[in-house]
Design a protein with these regions (language model features):
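A short beta-loop-alpha structural element at the N-terminal edge
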Residues: 3-17
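Conserved GNAT-fold acetyl-CoA-binding loop/helix
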Residues: 23-43
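Conserved beta-hairpin
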Residues: 52-69
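Conserved acyl-donor/pantetheine-binding loop and adjacent beta-alpha core of acyl/acetyltransferases
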Residues: 68-102
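Conserved acetyl-CoA-binding loop-helix of GNAT-fold acetyltransferases
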Residues: 99-116, 133-138
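Conserved GNAT acetyl-CoA-binding A-motif
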Residues: 117-128
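Conserved catalytic-core motifs of GNAT/GCN5-like acyltransferases
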Residues: 124, 142-156
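Conserved active-site alpha-helix within GNAT-family acetyltransferase domains
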Residues: 128-145
Length: 165
């Protein structure tokens, strides 16, 4: 049975392995810069756990994916260039989503779970992250424009999906 739950400290080794696999996958697929060699940092992961926004996806008790999710907004989403968000309603944000090597469907499962939590999701990704862009398109996300990361760390393509009422 597949389920999503909050991250626990004992999940860290599995998460680190998943993040390492994700970094290698990105490099192999023409996206060496988005996560580099050390992203996400341990400090980021610890903060996500402390703020209860770090989650893991388990399949038959094995961790197959991890992500950060919050409905507290995202400061870098206040300004968007070359487009506009679909609405100004409260939204959830997904960050640092990664699936274990060889896992199929886990990222879609996680994204769908997030949508079930609030019905309005915003997410951003690197221009070179074609696999993620493909997943977002497959799941029905709309490209909204470009956002700028904090501290001049670059730009990201911004997407949104909402439950139609």
């Amino acid at each position: 049975m597949v389920k999503i739950r909050h991250t626990r400290p004992e999940d860290l080794p599995a998460m680190q392995e998943i993040f390492a696999d994700a970094r290698a996958f990105m490099r192999e697929n023409g996206n060496p810069d988005q996560w580099g060699d050390k992203f996400p940092t341990q400090e980021m992961i610890d903060k996500d756990i402390a703020l209860h926004r770090s989650y893991v996806c388990e399949d038959e008790g094995k961790i197959v994916a991890t992500f950060a999710f919050t409905t507290d907004g995202e400061p870098t989403y206040r300004v968007i260039h070359g487009g506009a968000w679909l609405d100004d309603a409260q939204y959830g944000v997904v960050h640092r989503i990664a699936a274990a090597k060889g896992t199929r469907g886990a990222a879609s499962f996680c994204m769908n779970w997030c949508m079930e939590q609030c019905g309005n999701i915003r997410i951003d990704t690197h221009a070179n992250n074609k696999p993620m862009q493909g997943l977002l398109k497959k799941l029905g996300y709309t490209y909204c424009g470009v956002i700028e990361l904090e501290n001049g760390r670059g730009e990201r393509l911004a997407f949104q999906k909402r439950v139609e009422k």
